[in-house]
Amino acid sequence: VTTRALRESTQINGVREYIYGDRISRIHWNATAKTGIWKSKEFERESLPKTVVMLDRCRTHYRGAAHFELAVSVAASLLEYGQRQQLAMGLLSVGKEAVYLEPGKLSSHYRRMQHHLIGAEADGSHPIQRVLQERVRHFDPGCFFVIVSPLADERMYQALRWIQLRQTNPCLVAVDAGLDRQAAGEWQRRLRARGIVFYAVDRLEQLPDALGGGAR
């Protein structure tokens, strides 16, 4: 989730179908009169691209249970943040079983994603890029794709570039990747040169600062 996806605005960005419960002040009277169908004003935040959070569940990528639990906590925190911001977010989680929940905003949808994370295990064996290749048809062009993973190496770089070349906006949240300061700096520069957003999170407490842009 990048700051580009979190801007709040009251500026009208377009017109959408009327949804039961919309306030009268939201009705777009001109569009309704022209089409004969109820229309509502769409604001900038509502029209922002959808976001998919991918949790890396490959067993060999983690040093142990605590390492994976940190990744799960980061993914859960990202979803909580998205819910507070009223963003349309989805979840991709592939281990022994594959789960893909399309981006949505309903509270029930967020509860379903969080419920999945509670029982998620690091029981996968497929490389990141293979997981993406098998599911790329589900991702809308222009969507934000956030990978939560401990990988910060050539395999991850190629996966991020592969996503980017398919008209999505990749972001990596590297969870306790074990990079020293020099290696982390080189990794950041390499991704930044490609326009890829990168956050390094070694502890869950660092995530709020990262979301605020301080770790990019």
Q: For each of these PLM feature ranges, what is it?
A:
Residues 12, 48, 110-111, 184:
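Alpha-helix initiation and N-capping motif
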